[in-house]
């Protein structure tokens, strides 16, 4: 059964379609959007090897002319150089303003495809077809697109909304366990910042550390409630002028860890988990929430199979310095998203470097 979640924003609207087992019907879902004939699929070789034929055949069946551009997997390729190569392919196939770029992949592919679509001919159509849990519940929704800069993650980008987010949860069967757990970090985030009932439902599940531990109903619930939480926030604050910043819970320290480890040894979800644990400890030091609540958060992170300790090779002073490049810095002050209870957070710029350092020292993997 398909679930449709409408996203209504001041200047546009689109749907998130959650349709298990229906990747082969993608073309028919695009037909009502009145897109131009040309479609450029952007993916990575591994994902395209799994799902490329299904998607291409579906689009051709609906009368689209289909081209492809493959980018090697990983954050290391999330660069302006990679975007320039997408432009070359778009030019080669003469993509027009009515044409469409489809992101078939995880969060990295989605971010890059959105940025390429936003900037090619000053903006062409863009469709998200996420294949990782992290992309399904977070990265594909809300219109944040971009690439990394050597000094920080996602520093170059644009807000650019897709015409459709098309989610087929059945594609997760090919997702590596580590990537599944990374996606679960974002699901836990929604439980902390917005949806207490989701958090409690995750607590009640027997196991959460691999896809096979979830029945279809629980997986559908996790994806649907997470998508709805993000839509609720984004629909109130599309351009992150206020409320939307809460979606960065765990990301302030998390992004710094990712950047300083070269986007190689620690993936996004793992870094976010480390950041959430740190934020929970900071919230205790500022008397914002209780020891019991941070224990519940940390136990759920552990239940998912995520490591929350910080590598001892990481220079904590460098982490603190790197925070100054965070996108949420305002008037020179680093803004943290801090929990006040399960399901509620605040935005604070009152976190001193001393508090950050003391928390992270205790979080280092001994």
Swiss-Prot record:
Keywords: Amino-acid biosynthesis, Aromatic amino acid biosynthesis, Cobalt, Cytoplasm, Lyase, Metal-binding, NAD, Nucleotide-binding, Zinc. It comes from the Bacteria. It is found in: Cytoplasm. One of its GO terms (molecular function) is metal ion binding. NAD(+) binds at residues 107-111, 131-132, 144, 153. Catalyzes the conversion of 3-deoxy-D-arabino-heptulosonate 7-phosphate (DAHP) to dehydroquinate (DHQ). The lineage of its organism: Bacteria, Bacillati, Cyanobacteriota, Cyanophyceae, Oscillatoriophycideae. This is 3-dehydroquinate synthase. Binds 1 divalent metal cation per subunit. Can use either Co(2+) or Zn(2+). Belongs to the sugar phosphate cyclases superfamily. Dehydroquinate synthase family. It is an enzyme of class 4 (lyase). HAMAP family: DHQ_synthase (MF_00110). Its EC number is 4.2.3.4. Its main location: cytoplasm. One of its GO terms (cellular component) is cytoplasm. It comes from Rippkaea orientalis (strain PCC 8801 / RF-1) (Cyanothece sp. (strain PCC 8801)). Pathway: Metabolic intermediate biosynthesis; chorismate biosynthesis; chorismate from D-erythrose 4-phosphate and phosphoenolpyruvate: step 2/7. Zn(2+) binds at residues 186, 251, 268. The keyword Lyase applies. Its cofactor is Co(2+); Zn(2+); NAD(+). One of its GO terms (biological process) is chorismate biosynthetic process.
């Amino acid at each position: 059964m398909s679930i449709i979640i409408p996203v209504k924003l001041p200047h546009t609207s689109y749907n998130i379609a959650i349709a298990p087992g229906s990747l082969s019907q993608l073309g028919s879902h695009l037909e009502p959007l009145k897109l131009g004939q040309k479609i450029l699929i952007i993916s990575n070789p591994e994902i395209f090897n799994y799902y490329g034929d299904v998607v291409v055949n579906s689009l051709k069946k609906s009368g689209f002319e289909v081209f492809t551009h493959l980018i090697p997997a990983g954050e290391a390729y999330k660069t302006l150089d990679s975007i320039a190569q997408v432009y070359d392919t778009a030019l080669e196939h003469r993509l027009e303003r009515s044409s469409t770029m489809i992101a078939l992949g995880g969060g990295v592919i989605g971010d890059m495809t959105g940025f390429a679509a936003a900037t090619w001919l000053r903006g062409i159509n863009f469709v998200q077809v996420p294949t990782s849990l992290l992309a399904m519940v977070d990265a594909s929704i809300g219109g944040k697109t971009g690439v990394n800069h050597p000094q920080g993650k996602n520093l170059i980008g644009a807000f650019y909304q897709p015409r459709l987010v098309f989610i087929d949860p059945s594609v997760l069967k090919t997702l590596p366990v580590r990537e599944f757990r990374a996606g679960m970090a974002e699901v836990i985030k929604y439980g902390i910042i917005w949806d207490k009932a989701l958090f409690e439902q995750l607590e009640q599940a027997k196991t959460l550390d691999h896809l096979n531990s979830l029945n279809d109903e629980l997986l559908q619930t996790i994806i649907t409630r997470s998508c709805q939480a993000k839509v609720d926030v984004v629909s109130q604050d599309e351009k992150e002028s206020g409320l939307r910043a809460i979606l960065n819970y765990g990301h302030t320290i998390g992004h710094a860890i990712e950047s300083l480890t070269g986007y190689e040894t620690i993936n996004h979800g793992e870094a976010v988990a480390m950041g959430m644990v740190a934020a929970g400890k900071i919230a205790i030091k500022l008397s914002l929430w209780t020891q019991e609540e941070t224990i519940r958060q940390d136990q759920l992170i552990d239940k998912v199979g995520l490591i929350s300790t910080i590598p001892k090779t990481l220079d904590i002073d460098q982490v603190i310095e790197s925070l100054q490049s965070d996108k949420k810095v305002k008037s020179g002050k680093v803004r943290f998203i801090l929990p006040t209870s399960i399901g509620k957070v605040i935005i604070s710029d009152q976190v001193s470097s001393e508090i950050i350092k003391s928390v992270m020292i205790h979080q280092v993997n001994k």
